[in-house]
Amino acid sequence: MRNASPRQQRLLERIYQRSGVMHRHCIPLPDSSNPSTAERMRSYQPAALELALEACRLALKDAGIEASAITHLITVSCTGFGAPGFDLALIANLPLAMDVARTHVGFMGCHGAFNGLRVARAFVEADPSACVLLCAVELCSLHLQEGWNPDHIVANALFADGAGAVVAVAADGADVGSINKTDLQLVASTSTVLPGTEELMGWIIEDHGFSMVLSSKVPSRIAAQLRPWLEQWLASLGLTLPEVETWAVHPGGPRILAAVLESAGLQPAQIDLSTAVLRQFGNMSSATILFILERLRTTAGREGPCLALGFGPGLTVEAALLKVQKPI
């Protein structure tokens, strides 16, 4: 931060040291001081496409599926806009069939990929022959903000750029979606808005990028209100909290992870994948949960029910129950 006083410099160092982020990736910002939203959006489209292409190619290769077999394309992003968007560019560059069905989940925030997964599951339930490619790409660094607004300082310390993708098909003999073929099944999902929290988190379009509203009250509200809702939903599925040993929690930041630990009565080891992704990549908004699920799929010794959680403006809480079963 330019022209920081010694006191301000110490504040920045303290916030960054406590962010839980050791490494992250960011695209170069436009070559101007405090660029306009229009300048930032001009940088979004080509960079988003580059990251999305890499993520989609990796997902297709991992699933053993040709791009031409994809019947549905779902894209997720809250950090940029454009029409035609990067989804059409994916069709041309992967390439996908020209008649692929496209759905975009836009501007929902960090929990956007949960909604994308829900849509993917609906597609494969409606048509068992469907083959869905889901891609979430976020360029959070485009919206770095100058100045000493506390919300902006925290956001600058946490957020990063990244893209993740998965392939979803109908699971053999089950009415559920399967991520990257057979090893991670989406069994059920749900969503709620925590009462009285509408003003605590926001993502606002302003003249110089998108601006984050992030109240310090968010973790305490999650800690107080999460458990009763989760217990009720899990009971409807015949499960209790102690029966869920594996968790995939969107790491909005260390305090949000700590709030989930407190509310759900978890041990730190149960969210180690979330902590590791935050440390290695930062908070990549909607793409982050796909990084965590990828590690869940490929980590030995993690089988059985898994509960994924995401948080966003509202305060919205998204939950997904997944079944981890390693391929034979």
Residue ranges and their predicted role:
Residues 38-44, 75, 102-105, 151-153, ...:
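A short glycine/serine-rich beta->alpha loop
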Residues 75, 133-134, 167, 249, ...:
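Structural beta-sheet core signal
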